[in-house]
Amino acid sequence: MVMTDPIADMLTRIRNANMVRHEKLEVPASKIKKEIAELLKREGFIRDVEYIEDNKQGILRIFLKYGANNERVITGLKRISKPGLRVYAKADEVPRVLNGLGIALVSTSKGVMTDKDARQLQTGGEVVAYVW
């Protein structure tokens, strides 16, 4: 079966693995998924991400992060712009998530970045997802 929304699939896999406190998960790789995973690592939501070559499209292995008492670092993930309904934001309309406690992933002409980075660079784009 053809996957219509690979980004939503990746976010769902992260959400599900996080709910049962798995240490790591694997998703089929793509350029945008790798950018999103690297961004989540930079923002401290996941511990590590590595690319594994498999002579097809590759695999991203994502290592989840948990707090001192095994509490979840990622409390929520939500896909915003979907294939059936794209959501775009101008530079001055980039949304804040939980008054800055979470991040919005924005796909711009300069790559995938957080809402904070998009505001600093004064660039808009497609609002991919919210993470908090």
Curated annotation (Swiss-Prot):
Coiled-coil region(s): none
Gene Ontology CC: ribonucleoprotein complex; ribosome
Leader peptide range in chain numbering: none
Keyword annotations: Ribonucleoprotein, Ribosomal protein, RNA-binding, rRNA-binding
GO MF term (any one): structural constituent of ribosome
ATP-binding is among the record's keywords: no
Quaternary assembly: Part of the 30S ribosomal subunit. Contacts proteins S5 and S12.
PANTHER family in the record: 40S RIBOSOMAL PROTEIN S15A
General function of this protein: One of the primary rRNA binding proteins, it binds directly to 16S rRNA central domain where it helps coordinate assembly of the platform of the 30S subunit.
Name of this chain's protein: Small ribosomal subunit protein uS8
Gene giving rise to this polypeptide: rpsH
